[in-house]
């Protein structure tokens, strides 16, 4: 079937609405919407919830950009795309809670198509979801990964193991030699066996995010925390910033295509701290995190 970018866009707009509504229902605060246009073509709508009852900052961004030439970040590993016009659309979100016992979560789903006269379009889907805890709870990790596995199951037994490994490999801070969190799913360049199958999988990932995350929020939101936990949360948020600015391909793509900087950097935590050569106290809950985020089979 010929790729149908219009249907993908309509799903993404509905997905943004659905996720924002569910996050607001849990938090009690509302999102503020900021619609924007891109001079070179396209635009989007960024929605941010700040200083809510549970979420310090939650950003859910929809973007749809297009142009006459591919950016360098996209053609570096796909040289056959040079000289093609392109459309890129997606929903990307990051949620940073107040409570350090609630993990930070990230998800995104996206569609890309590049065309030129006289040639078949080149298209693919990408996306995923991943979880970044500050204090590890095994039941939360198991729930997160079980939900990820279950949404993959209709598409084949090998889908979850493959995309879990890809997620573990992708969200790795090489300069720190550590994982960003406990992973989840990551996929890119998905265009087989056909458009309908790939689109259905992308929808399953997008719709699965709130099923994976919100039960964890409900389970942890009443836990009492203090200055010690907050300081550790801010310190670990530094790793999040480092990954996004140094390693994340999506951030690089957005900046290279003249995307909207405020929306691209919306994933950044509102507060963060670095401390030179800080080490957690041996045997402490903070020290346990480094072991908790090691790659493993959670289910």
Curated annotation (Swiss-Prot):
| One Pfam family cited in the UniProt record for this chain | Coprogen_oxidas
Instruction: List the subcellular locations.
Output: Cytoplasm
Query: What InterPro entries does the database record attribute to this sequence?
Result: Coprogen_oxidase_aer, Coprogen_oxidase_aer_sf, Coprogen_oxidase_CS
List positions binding a divalent metal cation: 96, 106, 145, 175
Q: Name one GO biological process term.
A: protoporphyrinogen IX biosynthetic process
Q: Where does substrate bind?
A: 92, 108-110, 258-260
Q: What cofactor is needed?
A: a divalent metal cation
Q: What is its EC number?
A: 1.3.3.3
Q: Where is this site: Important for dimerization?
A: 175
Keyword presence, Metal-binding: yes
Q: Main EC class of this protein?
A: oxidoreductase
Pathway listed = Porphyrin-containing compound metabolism; protoporphyrin-IX biosynthesis; protoporphyrinogen-IX from coproporphyrinogen-III (O2 route): step 1/1
Recorded GO CC terms: cytoplasm
Q: Which reaction does it catalyse?
A: coproporphyrinogen III + O2 + 2 H(+) = protoporphyrinogen IX + 2 CO2 + 2 H2O
Q: Which UniProt keywords apply?
A: Cytoplasm, Heme biosynthesis, Metal-binding, Oxidoreductase, Porphyrin biosynthesis
| Catalytic residues of the enzyme | 106 (proton donor)
Query: A single Gene Ontology molecular function, please?
Result: metal ion binding
Major location, coarse class?
cytoplasm
Q: Where is this region: Important for dimerization?
A: 240-275
**Quaternary structure and partners:** Homodimer.
Role description: Involved in the heme biosynthesis. Catalyzes the aerobic oxidative decarboxylation of propionate groups of rings A and B of coproporphyrinogen-III to yield the vinyl groups in protoporphyrinogen-IX.
User: Which family does the record assign?
Assistant: Belongs to the aerobic coproporphyrinogen-III oxidase family.
Would you tell me the protein name for this molecule? Oxygen-dependent coproporphyrinogen-III oxidase
Record the organism.
Answer: Salmonella enteritidis PT4 (strain P125109)
Q: Which gene encodes it?
A: hemF
């Amino acid at each position: 079937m010929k790729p149908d970018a219009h249907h993908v866009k309509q799903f993404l707009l509905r997905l943004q609405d659905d996720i924002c509504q569910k996050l607001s229902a849990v938090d009690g605060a509302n999102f503020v919407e900021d619609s924007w246009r891109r001079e070179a073509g396209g635009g989007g709508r960024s929605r941010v919830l700040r200083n809510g009852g549970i979420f310090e900052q939650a950003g859910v961004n929809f973007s749809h950009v297009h142009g006459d030439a591919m950016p360098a970040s996209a053609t570096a590993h796909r040289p056959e795309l040079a000289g093609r016009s392109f459309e890129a659309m997606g929903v990307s979100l990051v949620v940073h809670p107040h409570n350090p016992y609630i993990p930070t979560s990230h998800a995104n789903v996206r569609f890309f198509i590049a065309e030129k006269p006289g040639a078949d379009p080149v298209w693919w889907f990408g996306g995923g979801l991943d979880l970044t805890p500050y204090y590890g709870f095994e039941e939360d990790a198991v729930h997160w990964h079980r939900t990820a596995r279950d949404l993959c199951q209709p598409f084949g037994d090998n889908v979850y193991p493959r995309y879990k490994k890809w997620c573990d490999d992708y969200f790795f801070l090489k300069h720190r030699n550590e994982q960003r969190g406990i992973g989840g799913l990551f996929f890119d360049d998905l265009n087989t066996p056909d458009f309908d199958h790939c689109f259905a999988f992308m929808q399953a990932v997008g719709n699965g995010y709130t099923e994976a995350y919100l039960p964890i929020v409900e389970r942890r939101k009443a836990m009492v925390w203090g200055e010690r936990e907050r300081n550790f949360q801010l310190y670990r948020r530094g790793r999040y910033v480092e990954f996004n600015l140094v390693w994340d391909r999506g951030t690089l793509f957005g900046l290279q295509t003249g995307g909207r900087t405020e929306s691209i950097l919306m994933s950044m935590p509102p507060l963060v701290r670095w401390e030179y050569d800080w080490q957690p106290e041996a045997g402490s809950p903070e020290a346990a995190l480094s072991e908790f985020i090691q790659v493993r089979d959670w289910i």
